[in-house]
Amino acid sequence: MNKYEKIAKGIVVNRIRSSWIEIFKFYNEQTSKEIGTLSTAFVLMTINEKFGTQVTKIAPRMGMEPNSLSRLLKSLEEKELVFKRKDTKDKRKVYICLTENGLKLRNIAAKRLFSLEKSIKDKISTTDLSAFYKVTDTICLLYTSPSPRDH
């Protein structure tokens, strides 16, 4: 292990990033032909299958910037996986709804994601998972304070 690798291994942010990249790559390899990326899977699963989901609620649920989400939604629309529906009572509200094909892919994405989740939980002890959840929750709380000056 070289000096950079030794230093990087001890940096929390790098470990989180590296783990996420490996999970992302693994999931994408498993689903790229059917679904596309993990981001696509998460968007499809965020959308209520019966009523759709208000477009303004999707980005915060996913932790995405609105601009990134807009590009992703446009791509999903072009692939005919989702469509936009305006609220009949309040025209300012726009809902993203799943097409029939979008619903099929949502179900595939959910199965694959829960399969990945199960494989992780099968290999990691409950104690270690609890510690992981505690640490990640604490990290999130550190950076969700109201003022950037608090960091």
Predicted region positions:
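N-terminal leader segment of winged-helix/HTH proteins
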Residues: M1-E34
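C-terminal regulatory/oligomerization modules of transcriptional regulators
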Residues: M1-E5, T127-S145
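N-terminal positioning helix adjacent to the helix-turn-helix/winged-helix DNA-binding module
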Residues: A8, V12, L38-T40, N101
